[in-house]
Amino acid sequence: MTEMLKGIAASDGVAVAKAYLLVQPDLSFETVTVEDTSAEEARLDAALAASQDELSVIREKAVESLGEEAAAVFDAHLMVLADPEMTGQIKETIRAKQVNAEAALTEVTDMFIAIFEGMEDNPYMQERAADIRDVTKRVLANLLGKKLPNPATINEESIVVAHDLTPSDTAQLNKKYVKAFVTNIGGRTSHSAIMARTLEIAAVLGTNNITELVKDGDILAVSGITGEVVINPTEEQIAEFKAAGEAYAKQKAEWALLKDAQTVTADGKHFELAANIGTPKDVEGVNDNGAEAVGLYRTEFLYMDSQDFPTEDDQYEAYKAVLEGMNGKPVVVRTMDIGGDKELPYFDLPKEMNPFLGYRALRISISETGNQMFRTQLRALLRASVHGKLRIMFPMVALLTEFRTAKGILEEEKAKLVAEGVAVADDIEVGIMIEIPAAAMLADQFAKEVDFFSIGTNDLIQYTMAADRMNEQVSYLYQPYNPSILRLINNVIKAAHAEGKWAGMCGEMAGDQTAVPLLVGMGLDEFSMSATSVLRTRSLMKKLDTAKMEEYANRALTECSTMEEVLELSKEYVNVD
């Protein structure tokens, strides 16, 4: 029987293939009284070690297929496994209650999950609850001798169907065989959606009940462009979906022809299309997709991939590799953004109720605790500056005094290197990320002292709307097109231009095809996105008329009071298919 569902279009693409139902094993168990608690602790240690080995392998595969940024979610999982407080409590429960490891594990992790989930105003802690739940499932499976589903074993063209896909599930998808996936829950900003876009696999999320309607082997037709899913489609529907897939493939082939083209609008105005990276390995993808710059190099992955603080020489080699790999094209390097959801096992940070609003990023760098680490990074960057066109960017800046302090440290290290006879480029631009509303509101003052702005919309939207984009209960508040967000962005761009400076954007919004026309109208100079979005965005920009987009942006800023009104207005101005 044919049935149609509508979900959230999370990753572009069209596919028709057999359904592969990702079924979770039965992890139920009985609580058993044990006499030999030492043996039970040994069982727990073995399960923890096996889980750690599995996650390490999955992380390595994720780095290869998805890049360092997407793979970083597994660092949080590995940290849960290594958390001495939690593992210590599990062992204490085994000894005190003389119960089997399964019962102790579940009792302790359920307690942690309940505590973290109870912090409803703290999205960071709620994300930790999700990490603990995912890791607990893996450890429990190892204790019970059960195998978790392994999507890596799929060896024929399939569409994966699941209630939800964990990051470890998504990281194991082989896009040679997995043509799409569909889930009951999730949205465009979930980890699985972001990974799907990186892998270029079609995805439709949030269908509510796809797992109740589909059996293994059913034929599915999926459009990650429209969000439509058809179960056991008719021959006519299959033909329609295949035609849509061919049209999309043809469109992608046309985009590929733009690799070496200039990014200019229909009326000849140039905009810079850049790409975001996490490691030197990512530069190949930047060049393959015709990006004109690296608009965001997230250097924290250098720290997260090390067992200790990376040395000045190690960092120098990494920065040099990126600058040389870009062959003179600009590279914006963000200084370390540690803290929040990025912890280092070798760097003790204080436990905080809300780390996203606490001691992180530049706040650590300019503090006494992080000062030497910051100076080491700046020296490495300054030494590497002679190998390309370096731009340095400070993250999480709220106050002008923070920028002045950071720039002062940079100047001190530059003077030391010059005194040592080390060559340093004399044309390094220094800017800040605009991700805190306070900085966006005071952009006119910052613009007098910085060389550029890069707007980090992911955090700017969260902080402005007071809504975690990963929290489904408040995800409706994560509104890139809300007029309040658009006005903040416009304020930053205009402030930069008033001082003869440039403004870029490195959040997801920069590559959002709905947002690009608005941002062109506002005069954003540089758009930095995932490398796989560059060619598509270049194609879109070639069809836009700047004057028309300026009129559209002006009306959106002055006439609209809701996101829905902005999106409705876009229909009058944007028709580039």
From Swiss-Prot:
Homodimer. One of its GO terms (molecular function) is kinase activity. General (non sugar-specific) component of the phosphoenolpyruvate-dependent sugar phosphotransferase system (sugar PTS). This major carbohydrate active-transport system catalyzes the phosphorylation of incoming sugar substrates concomitantly with their translocation across the cell membrane. Enzyme I transfers the phosphoryl group from phosphoenolpyruvate (PEP) to the phosphoryl carrier protein (HPr). The reaction takes place in three steps, mediated by a phosphocarrier histidine residue located on the surface of the central domain. The two first partial reactions are catalyzed at an active site located on the N-terminal domain, and the third partial reaction is catalyzed at an active site located on the C-terminal domain. For catalytic turnover, the central domain swivels from the concave surface of the N-terminal domain to that of the C-terminal domain. Pfam families: PEP-utilisers_N, PEP-utilizers, PEP-utilizers_C. It is found in: Cytoplasm. It comes from Streptococcus salivarius. Keywords: Cytoplasm, Kinase, Magnesium, Metal-binding, Phosphotransferase system, Sugar transport, Transferase, Transport. It catalyses: L-histidyl-[protein] + phosphoenolpyruvate = N(pros)-phospho-L-histidyl-[protein] + pyruvate. This is Phosphoenolpyruvate-protein phosphotransferase. Its cofactor is Mg(2+). The N-terminal domain contains the HPr binding site, the central domain the pyrophosphate/phosphate carrier histidine, and the C-terminal domain the pyruvate binding site. GO terms for cellular component: cytoplasm. One of its GO terms (biological process) is phosphoenolpyruvate-dependent sugar phosphotransferase system. Its EC number is 2.7.3.9. It comes from the Bacteria. The keyword Transferase applies. Disulfide bonds: none annotated. InterPro entries: PEP-util_enz_mobile_dom, PEP-utilizing_PTS_enzyme, PEP_util_AS, PEP_util_C, PEP_util_CS, Phosphohistidine_dom_sf, PTS_EI, PTS_EI-like. The active site is at H191 (tele-phosphohistidine intermediate), C506 (proton donor). Phosphoenolpyruvate binds at R298, R334, N458, D459, R469. Mg(2+) binds at E435, D459.
